[in-house]
């Protein structure tokens, strides 16, 4: 998470997690099947929640539900265990890279950027040796230009931040699927992010999945610390945040389900938006907007929830396999 270490608030945990040993039952809701995406032959789109810093890779108990979903649900949505259906590459839009213009990582073998501080030494030695794909990066840049998105940049030196390697270590520990990383816009302009997603629709037809890595339901560090220190709903402030979170998630899910383009253009007017994502602090919401733009109008969204700090954290997806 940006500009703060949660490690000092949490204390030591159990060490780098053994993914196969983690099991957790969380909530899933399905609004339709994946039939439209299957008919069109499109790779899935997923706006996932990546957790706080490297904590999902440390087995942090507060991330138990998120860890389970990253290591079990997301691979199922992407059909990663089916060699005939798994995507040939992933375009990953990360909340931890904000730029003035749409920017795409063009490196064939990206380094990792350990953009967190105050964590155990082993978190600065993590490796995720998946390849980049300069050809797909160039294709995505051309799609952005065709959409009229301005001065698109392909950055051959940019490494992968923890919005990429932390969730992907859980999603695909084999690290055998190429990844192209994309920035969000510092302007936080929702229409531009919707258009970024729309530009990527054609790449879905080439079996390239689109993954947004953020924290769409809740990314307010001050409120998160209040929830952790107050033991959640046992404190009046925690109960207040939980109530606002429920109202926000209900309104947001209704918008994403029924009117994503117009509704997300006006997302700041949704109840609770400024608490869940403080003004000028909406970067962790932008990947969801781009993912919604990458979905075709006839595709219906599905979602599941994870528990985090006593509130529901939603992951939205279009296409792919249903999960429970």
UniProtKB/Swiss-Prot annotation:
Signal peptide, first to last residue: 1-25
Taxonomy, superkingdom: Eukaryota
Annotated keywords: Dioxygenase, Metal-binding, Oxidoreductase, Signal, Zinc
InterPro entries linked to this entry: Extradiol_dOase_DODA, Xdiol_dOase_suB
Gene Ontology MF term list: ferrous iron binding; oxidoreductase activity, acting on single donors with incorporation of molecular oxygen, incorporation of two atoms of oxygen; zinc ion binding
Cofactor binding remark: Binds 1 zinc ion per subunit.
Family (UniProt): Belongs to the DODA-type extradiol aromatic ring-opening dioxygenase family.
Job description of the protein: Dioxygenase; part of the gene cluster that mediates the biosynthesis of the tetramic acids Sch210971 and Sch210972, potential anti-HIV fungal natural product that contain a decalin core. The PKS module of tasS together with the enoylreductase tasC catalyze the formation of the polyketide unit which is then conjugated to 4-hydroxyl-4-methyl glutamate (HMG) by the condensation domain of the tasS NRPS module.
The protein's assembly and partners: Monomer.
The protein's name in its UniProt record: Dioxygenase tasH
Organism: Hapsidospora irregularis
Organism phylogeny: Eukaryota, Fungi, Dikarya, Ascomycota, Pezizomycotina
Gene name as annotated: tasH
């Amino acid at each position: 998470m940006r500009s703060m270490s949660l490690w000092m608030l949490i204390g030591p945990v159990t060490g780098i997690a053994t993914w196969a040993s983690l099991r957790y039952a969380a909530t899933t809701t399905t609004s339709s099947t994946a039939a439209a995406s299957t008919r069109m032959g499109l790779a899935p789109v997923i706006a996932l929640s990546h957790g706080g810093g490297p904590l999902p890779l440390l087995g942090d108990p507060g991330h138990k539900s998120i860890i389970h979903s990253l290591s079990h649900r997301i691979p199922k949505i992407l059909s990663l265990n089916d060699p005939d259906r798994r995507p040939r590459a992933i375009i990953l839009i990360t909340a931890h890279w904000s730029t003035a213009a749409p920017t795409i990582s063009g490196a064939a073998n990206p380094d990792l950027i350990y953009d967190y501080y105050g964590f155990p030494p082993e978190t600065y030695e993590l490796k995720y040796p998946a390849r980049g794909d300069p050809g797909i990066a160039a294709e995505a840049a051309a799609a952005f230009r065709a959409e009229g998105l301005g001065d698109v940049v392909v950055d051959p030196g940019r490494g992968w931040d923890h919005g990429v390697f932390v969730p992907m270590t859980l999603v695909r520990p084999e690290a055998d699927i190429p990844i192209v990383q994309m920035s969000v816009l510092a302007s936080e302009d929702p229409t531009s992010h919707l258009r970024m997603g729309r530009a990527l629709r054609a790449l879905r037809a080439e079996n390239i999945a689109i993954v947004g890595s953020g924290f769409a339901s809740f990314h307010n560090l001050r409120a998160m610390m209040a929830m952790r220190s107050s033991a959640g709903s046992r404190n009046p402030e925690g109960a207040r945040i939980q109530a606002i979170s429920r109202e926000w998630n209900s309104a947001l899910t209704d918008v994403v389900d029924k009117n994503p383009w117009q509704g997300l253009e006006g997302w700041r007017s949704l109840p609770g938006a400024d608490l869940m994502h403080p003004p000028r602090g909406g970067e962790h919401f932008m990947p969801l907007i781009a993912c919604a733009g990458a979905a075709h109008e006839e595709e219906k969204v599905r979602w599941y929830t994870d528990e985090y700090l006593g509130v529901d954290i939603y992951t939205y997806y279009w296409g792919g396999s249903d999960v429970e």
